From Swiss-Prot:
A Gene Ontology BP annotation from the UniProt entry: isoleucyl-tRNA aminoacylation
InterPro entries: aa-tRNA-synth_I_CS (IPR001412), aa-tRNA-synth_Ia (IPR002300), Anticodon_Ile_BEm (IPR033708), Ile-tRNA-ligase (IPR002301), Ile-tRNA-ligase_type1 (IPR023585), Ile-tRNA_ligase (IPR050081), M/V/L/I-tRNA-synth_anticd-bd (IPR013155), Rossmann-like_a/b/a_fold (IPR014729)
Entry protein name: Isoleucine--tRNA ligase
GO CC field: cytosol
Pfam families named among the record's database cross-references: Anticodon_1, tRNA-synt_1, zf-FPG_IleRS
Subunit annotation: Monomer.
Organism (species): Buchnera aphidicola subsp. Acyrthosiphon pisum (strain APS)
Amino acid sequence: MDDYKDTLNLPKTLFSMRGNLSKKEPNILKSWNENNLYKLIRKKNQEKKIFFLHDGPPYANGNIHIGHAVNKILKDIIIKSKNMSGFDAPYIPSWDCHGLPIEQKVEEKIKSNQGEISTTEFQEKCRKYAQDQVEKQKKDFIRLGVIGDWDNPHLTMNFKNEANIIKTLSKIVQKKHLYQDFKPIHWCLKCASSLSEAEIEYSKKKSDSIIVGFKFKYKSIIEKLFDFQISNKKEIHLLIWTTTPWTLPSSKAISIHPDFQYQLIETERCYLIIAKELVEKTLNTLKIKKSIIRNYVKGRFLEKMICLHPFLKNIDLPVILGKHVTLESGTGAVHTAPDHGLEDYIISQKYNIKTSNIVNFKGEYISNTHDKLDGVNVLEANSIIIELLIKNNTFFHHESLIHSYPHCWRHKSPVIYRATPQWFIDIDQKQLRIKLLQEIKKVRWIPEWGESRIGEMIKKRPDWCISRQRKWGVPMSIFIHKNTRKIHPNTFVFMKKIAKKVELEGLQVWWNIDSKEILGEEYQSYEKILDILDVWFESGNTHTTINYKNKNYTKKNADMFLEGSDQHRGWFMSSLIISTLISEKKPYSEVLTHGFVVDGKGQKMSKSIGNTISPNEIVDTLGADILRLWVASSNYSNDISISNEILKSSSDIYRRIRNTARFMLANISDFDPKKNIISKENMVLLDKWAIGQTKIVQEEIIQHYNNYNFHAVIQRLMYFCSIEMGSFYLDIIKDRQYTLKKHSQERRSSQTAIYYIINSLVRWIAPILSFTADEIWSYLPENNSQYVFMEEWFDKLFYLDQDDLFNYQFWNEIITIKHEINKFLEEAIQNKTINNSLETSIILYVSHELSNKLKILEQETKFIFLTSDIQIKLYDTAPKNAKKSKIVPYLKVSLEKIKGKKCPRCWHYFNFTKKNIKNSDICNRCILNTIGNGEKRIFI
């Protein structure tokens, strides 16, 4: 038997089957860097409409984690897809460079000589540390394949940006939204600083839950009010319930609801006053079996009654009215400590009850609080408080309670409310809160629930505490009068002057500057405020400083913000407040949020659990494209699961896409688009369908990109590669590709289709599988651009004419029939009736309509079903043993083992007769394709 291998057009490519991504990707990155790919893209797109995704600044501290990778990859996918959709989509990476974590890292390094270092020296060390962290993280982000202006990132610590932050605050001062107050704010004992709402996270905490009695000072008034004669031997207690016993030393009043009914209940021990609806529950908790309800009054009648502090001597506490009191739990009365609760503070203000602070910045009671409490940390004081209550006969009940409690997001430790003099932005001044709620309605929130979430936060949020008692941050840059404590009337002008100096020398200027230089002779009357700004104020201001606009950009805001769902109360909120306050406009048109990364069991990533996965480890072992594919495949609107099994699944998807691309590249190795392109009119019908189907898929994929449904992009890609191409089109054209004459129109027709399809496919995957797309692009003949990222979606695809007899409906029916026949063939192979489809004669029993269409295809029909022989008969003529399709109506199939000889060249079976050329063992078709004029194909 002759070897006919040299007569076949076998596929050939250097594009490897294995990705070897971890080895190849660094070289691809080197090419991008050496040729400055980002600038090439921007230059090519410079006249196009801008799409600007504003990068939320990650904190410049520590290695990147898997959450960072998810965020940056999602942004990169969007940027690249927008560039390919005809936009100029710049990407300017940002970093948040000030704040406590950096201070703490520097403090750890200089512990031995901390007292010898000046504030400005300390700030310089912080700046150096932050810059080092930026460089480290930048390297990791670049390794993920994220393309951006890495040489010119936005750093909040750049002098110009520090100055701009001061300018923004000056405008807020000018609009009279800044004020100072002595009110309770979240305070972290480990940070020794105030915290903003965005720096708080809620976790479960075990607390001491106690019920305490506040004795009424004047029994006779209560006796008269309840119209009942009180026993002289029994005290009257207004019961309160609290989970923060340590706040009792700060009690200034007891709040009750004006409209609730409060019952006077006599027990063996004393008289109790409890809200009517909570009496039964409270008595059960106290295990009081014998009691008598003596009378009741509305809460408003108890207003200004005087109670005694439960253990501090000679302190009278008034009963006050507040609608913040509820019947959900407790007793219907709450002790009121304006130092340690915002609602307590607000209600105390109405009664002119002054706020004082008996807890220092370390969380310790100050001197003269109580001889048992002085110097004690408040979080360790509950047991002492309970002892004092027992001693004073005001203790009624104690139990442990596990509940949700605010914690510091950095230290994961419980925080307290502590009253200190701080600076606030007034959220209700000039109807700012109402404007914020109006602006969020103009934003597209993805997912949609983001709008209601941030809306509820805006409705409930307190005024924004923007001051911090630290050193590494932008200074507030204001002076206040030493006596009146009011801001200098020319503060707006002074702040602009200070900002100019900061722009030249950095934030350290404020600590070094002589007040006289700014204030002149007034300097002796004013005090320089050394507080710095909340880092959320800094990051919330970034949208005002990044220069992303050109002549084609007319919007007043960024197109998109994209961050984790925790940023509704963080960066989204701070940016919205500042933008609305300064310009009365929203800072973004779209806000997209993603969930958090969890392990395969749905558990939160935690070092203590040991379930964390480093993005760098994934990149070093599997490659960045696998990580990018995992991100794109995930429904990021929910929490995103990751595990070795999930990454293996991503690798399997990758392998399918890569092998599809490899097959196509291998089959156009001898194809020159300048010479070999076949026009639509002269193409084989199946190739026209393939191009038309590719166009349909491209429209779907573009739509998914536009809607940010990247998992849908992957699903559509997989179906296209596996089903429409892999098990249908590419499978069918192998025969034509390999066995027809090399330069035949029929073969060049399928190569034209492949060329168009791979040109489309490489663009579809470029935003996600960026390294692989770049590699594929390097193997494609006749590229217009150096890099695929400089291209737009492929524009040479065309639709099938819907009026054609063989339209999409026909081909969809054929695909379905082919899948059905494949099932029957697999069954026959398993039963060892046949070995493969080519040694099978297939008889199709179909409807008149389909029979007429298939007969037009004549002998080419067999190539669709990869068989050596096919017969088309009417459905009604099918024998009883024909297999009936459960999916396709009017379809029955009979399979018979074919008779004849197997052609050693094309592997089809044929009847060997004397008509065959002498000494030839190949079929007539192969004879035509080797020494003849070539086989003709019209349809398949």
